């Protein structure tokens, strides 16, 4: 090896630039309002936003934020690669196909093709069974249940430790959104210690599938696992070094499903069937279709924040949960009150602009602990039977995610139901938002709901082998502190 070439030269990380590498010309739009603290003011919801050509995936998955080697990984996770690889593997008698699909993808396909969720599920199962000889097809709820259960367990333990030691009260941050995880590791490594180390439903589902087959003496090489996910960053998640043992071979999105059908000259609706026995016949041994095809309360991204507060509420009979909306629709706080005290709080926060403010709050020191106005809450409390929204209105308070115990962060505005890989082709921002609202409504109406807090420990205990539940974070040291407001102003 040449003396001029060292091991350190092999790191091909491309440091993010202050200016976006994919700029756009904006004319006639309103300027962003930045207050005296350097925070974006997003207190109002515009009636209609201008059409834009830069998406979140441009920001989080371009060469400004990922390495060139990761770009290769993205290209290796596509429907074309799946068709090529499975075309070869399917010729081997000892190989079989397993498909896992997230609830967001199922709802997106149902909405796109104008079908009920059940009809779309059966159509998708029938398509993969008949065209690719798929042996098993599962929903990702079992993986999500375990992910939620471990998350809640860790938040509660962390909070007890902080109360006993008087440690810093900054919130824990979720790591289940790969877009936010990548962004944090490579631009804000000082936030990495705040990340709660629990894998996403995608990866835990893969680990569960592998454990199931190992218990049946089926070698890892005998099956090919295709995962259908709502965003392209899920491809990078499956390619993380610690994720390779989870047994996911390829990740594609609903957009790629539609493209694949077009390339195969197939009509999705031609696979319509009323054979509901597919739910059971395509479930692996020990997998209850009433569970893995279900969902849970708390939101379409998993409901981690809601489920944590619910878990604490069960430990404190008589406590009341209130739901507080933030400055914009992408911020929500679940606050638990008991004897006029806030005993637990968790928030949902989505979108790059809200993430900018979150990072600024948590890194500038302005996110230090402050006393909440409990007196105001005490005076304005309604009766114990008031529902969450009535209580939120009565307190006249605004969500304060920066002082929560835990923040469920999602990179996409509108969260996972607005993932870049979904079939939400509306360019008009208002119509796109309306589509997300429609999908969220369908999620609550068409999916059966299960209790992850009860089922989580049981599923983990029933697993045939210990599951891989944690990431190995890889923060990148930054030579120069990035000015997030400057970055945002180029959008």
Swiss-Prot record:
Recorded GO MF terms: 4 iron, 4 sulfur cluster binding; iron-sulfur cluster binding; metal ion binding
Binding site for [4Fe-4S] cluster 1: 20, 59, 62, 65
Result, substituting residue 65 to A: Reduced iron content and strongly impaired maturation of cytosolic Fe/S proteins
Main subcellular location of this protein, as a coarse class: cytoplasm
Classification via SUPFAM superfamilies: Fe-only hydrogenase
GO cellular component, one term: cytosol
Compartments, record wording: Cytoplasm; Nucleus
Chain sites annotated for binding [4Fe-4S] cluster 2: 177, 231, 412, 416
Pfam families: Fe_hyd_lg_C
Keywords: 4Fe-4S, Cytoplasm, Iron, Iron-sulfur, Metal-binding, Nucleus
Effect of residue 62 to A: Reduced iron content and strongly impaired maturation of cytosolic Fe/S proteins
BP term (GO), one: iron-sulfur cluster assembly
Record's subunit section: Interacts with CIA1.
Family the entry assigns: Belongs to the NARF family.
Function: Essential component of a cytosolic Fe/S protein assembly machinery. Required for maturation of extramitochondrial Fe/S proteins. May play a role in the transfer of pre-assembled Fe/S clusters to target apoproteins.
Protein name: Cytosolic Fe-S cluster assembly factor NAR1
Naturally occurring in which organism (per UniProt): Saccharomyces cerevisiae (strain ATCC 204508 / S288c) (Baker's yeast)
């Amino acid at each position: 090896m040449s003396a001029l070439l060292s091991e350190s030269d092999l790191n091909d990380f491309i440091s993010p630039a202050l200016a976006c590498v994919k700029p756009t010309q904006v004319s006639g739009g309103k300027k962003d309002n930045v207050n005296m603290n350097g925070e974006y003011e997003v207190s109002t919801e515009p009636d209609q936003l201008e059409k834009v050509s830069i998406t979140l995936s441009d920001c989080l998955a371009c060469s400004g934020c990922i390495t060139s080697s990761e770009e290769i990984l993205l290209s290796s996770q596509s429907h074309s690669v799946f068709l090529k690889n499975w075309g070869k593997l399917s010729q081997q008698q000892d190989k079989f196909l397993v498909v896992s699909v997230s609830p967001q993808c199922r709802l997106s396909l149902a909405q796109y093709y104008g079908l009920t969720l059940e009809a779309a599920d059966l159509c998708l199962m029938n398509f993969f069974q008949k065209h690719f000889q798929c042996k098993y097809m599962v929903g990702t709820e079992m993986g999500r249940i375990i992910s939620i259960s471990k998350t809640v367990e860790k938040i509660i333990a962390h909070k007890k430790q902080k109360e006993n030691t008087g440690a810093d009260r900054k919130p824990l941050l979720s790591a289940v959104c790969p877009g936010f995880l990548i962004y944090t590791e490579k631009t804000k490594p000082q936030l990495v210690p705040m990340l709660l180390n629990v894998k996403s439903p995608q990866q835990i589902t893969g680990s569960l599938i592998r454990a199931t087959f190992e218990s049946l003496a089926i070698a890892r090489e005998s099956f090919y696992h295709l995962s259908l996910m709502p965003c392209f960053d899920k491809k990078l998640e499956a390619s993380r070094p610690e994720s390779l043992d989870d047994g996911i071979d390829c990740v594609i999105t609903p957009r790629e499903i539609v493209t694949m059908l077009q390339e195969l000259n197939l009509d999705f609706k031609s696979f319509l069937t009323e054979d509901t026995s597919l739910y059971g016949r395509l479930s692996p041994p020990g997998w209850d279709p009433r569970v893995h095809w279900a969902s849970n309360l708390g939101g379409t991204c998993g409901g981690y924040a809601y489920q944590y507060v619910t878990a604490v509420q069960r430990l404190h009979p008589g406590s009341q949960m209130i739901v507080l909306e933030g400055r914009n629709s992408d911020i929500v706080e679940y606050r638990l009150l008991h004897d006029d005290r806030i005993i637990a709080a968790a928030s949902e926060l989505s979108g790059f602009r809200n993430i900018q403010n979150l990072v600024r709050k948590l890194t500038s020191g302005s996110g230090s602990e402050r006393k909440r106005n409990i007196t105001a809450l005490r005076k304005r409390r309604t009766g114990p039977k008031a529902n969450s929204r009535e209580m939120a209105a009565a307190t006249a308070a605004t969500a304060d995610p920066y002082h929560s115990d835990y923040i469920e962060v999602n990179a996409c505005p509108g969260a996972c139901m607005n993932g870049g890989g979904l079939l939400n082709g509306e360019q008009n921002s208002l119509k796109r938002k309306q589509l997300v609202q429609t999908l969220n409504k369908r999620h609550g109406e068409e999916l059966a709901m299960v209790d992850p807090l009860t089922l989580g420990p049981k599923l983990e205990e029933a697993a045939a082998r210990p599951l891989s539940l944690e990431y190995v974070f890889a923060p990148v040291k930054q030579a120069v502190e990035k000015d997030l407001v400057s970055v945002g102003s180029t959008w």
